[in-house]
Amino acid sequence: MEIMIKKRDGHFEPLSVEKTQRMIAFACLGLDSCDPLELEMDAKLQFVDGMTTKEIQKTLVQTAIEKVISKKDDGFGNQVNKMNQDWQFVAARLFLFDLYKEAAITRRYKAFGYGNFPNLVNMLVEEKKYADFFVTEYTADELQELGDYIKPKRDYLFNYEGLKLLADRYLVKGFNKEIFELPQERFMAIAMHLALVEGENKVKYAKKFYDLMSQLKMTTATPTLANAGTPFHQLSSCFISGVDDNLWSIYDVNSKFSRVSKHGGALGIYLGKVRALNSDIRGFKNSSGGVIPWIRLYNDTAVAVDQLGKRKGGATVTLDIWHKDFYEFVELRTNNGDDRRKAHDIFPAISVPNIFMERMLARENFTLFDPHEILAVKGYSLEDYFDTEDEKEFTKRYIECEQDPNLHGIEVPALDMMKKIMRSAVETGTPFIFFRDTVNAANPNKHAGMIYASNLCHEIAQNVGFTNLAEEIINEDGTITTKTNTGDMVTCNLNSISLGRITDEELEENIALQIRMLDNVISINQAPVPESRMTSDKYRAIGLGTSGYHHYLVNHDIQWESDEHIEVADKLFENIAFYAIKASMELAKEKGAYPAFKGSEWETGEYFTRRGYTSDRWKQLAADVAKYGIRNGYLMAVAPTGSTSNIANTTAGIDPIFKKFFIEEKKGSFTPKTAPDLNDKTFWLYKEAHTIDQQWSIKACGVRQRHIDQAQSFNLYITPQMKAKEILDLYVEAYKQGIKTIYYIRNQSLEMDECTSCSS
């Protein structure tokens, strides 16, 4: 019986077997392990009368993707799972075929695939989907040259999951989700935007940036991927603000959070200065509600400002472990206790000083304080100090507070506090851990400030400040001028080297380009709040990270649980650090050092001596940095790269794979997923996260940390079978290895929310 199908324009016609065969042949071209006839026959069984062409296409895609993992007879009568990754690429091409057709309809041309690039740019500028600078800063000839440079065949590098994610979230679309942009055009638009500041060299650099992105050799931050080239180009991932102990500051940060969230960013909030529960207010005792009500305020903002209904806003709140509100705070996301004192959409983080870990290891007591009372009695804020190897200023003042009879501290066993942290972590994955003394001792810009907290994904370590109201002036014309004393508002500009997709020989050149791209983000970014702009200009801080770490190890035949892994990690990240610092120094020669360079550890050379960089190449680089400066005050930070690593078909951040293969169910469809380049050889090299001895992960993290000026989004993976002592040992070893932060404790029985903004 002849099957009638409904075309996109609404009319019916018989299903064309020849067209279907051509489409399948296109999808299977060059993929010898995928039989076009097998796909055609299996898909045909699902075709029914009245199907739309879109449904036909969807059936073909789903049939192909279900072939990635299939049941086969092993020759002994047993049904076993057989994997063929190439079917992911067949499915991607079938989906790509659909994108090409949709784009042709939306863009009103008959060509299949990529059309005239200058025409597209002009149309999207007119439609207010692209920013005007594409036509004001680039000539018609330059647009044509860049359009001719686009390589459509690089679309074939995507697997289905990566292409679908890119299309669903990042390609420019109309208000009704109609496709305007195709994948290579998204990469070129980003490249052209980031190259704008290069003046006469902008076309040259646009091509170089495009090549890196389109060959999946790097990943950009999610906001850059989504917003570059658009009229509002907020390109930064995460922000960090400090809250002072007054209403104006509390609500000012809430306002900043709403503006950051509106444009796809996430916020780290330091709340350690806010007075504790039952503290006094203006001398009235037992008046304060503590930090929890304000955290609930931020929680409500996260839910309300939901990024055009796409997702809730993301925020982490950091509190010092010695704060009297510790016990309520650590259970912020648990299901125990009064729900009116919970904030289930906020991610808590604990700032931990060395003295707490020392007391906990010695099974001694630890004292909780109210920061407001310390300031009133002692005249200083305890949270404004930290320990270094030579000076134990925080410890000295902390003990001084313990010995002061005018302070009403609460003494508790340090181990009991640690048990509370672990119990919450097992149940909720949080709190995140911020080892404050380790972080601040390694801060290259301690001459200019202090690091109080990290961002949502806990890879950023930069100076954090506090903005306060100076005065409000009523002007004669009826307007009001608000003046503030402005503090540093950290802004994270991120991208990542796709380690699984490049060779060691490409590292130096690629890193130089990625550093340039990140520095250009600072110059062109539309910051959501003024303090963000000011802080970005002051430090020109960036975060060069890595994705595809496990992929890289497997490509080099290295087992995760091996001494070779530790040695390779040390060498690899030393090289990354060297090339990154060198690239930033060369940029400083060209464009000038960051304004706060004078007095920094980059200038004094202490940054290099502390890390034991004594080889000739390092000595020369340290001398060059002292002479020419460095363009970026903060350079390296390893983000989790959850979604963007899927686009690049590589592993996320520095994490091991979660599963070698699994089947994901979404909206009734089943999608088999496999580790990158999984085959008979790599199957035995990939070890799944929850089966890995976490001590090896901690060792590797500690080795990498020496070479990273900021931090790493580092997860620990636990199982329900692990004993409390084993989990405690992980925290202790992380501290001893000099790891700066711990992100999630990923319990095998829990699912964690990822921060999409920080994905790079």
Predicted features, each with a name:
Residues 98-137, 145-153, 236-486, 490-496, ...:
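Active-site cavity-forming subdomains of large catalytic enzyme subunits
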Residues 51, 56, 66, 157-173, ...:
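Core structural elements
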Residues 178-248, 394-424, 428-433, 573-623:
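Gly/Pro-rich turn-and-neighbor structural signature
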Residues 149-169, 197-230, 258, 691-702:
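Conserved oxyanion/phosphate-binding beta-strand-loop segments in alpha/beta enzyme cores
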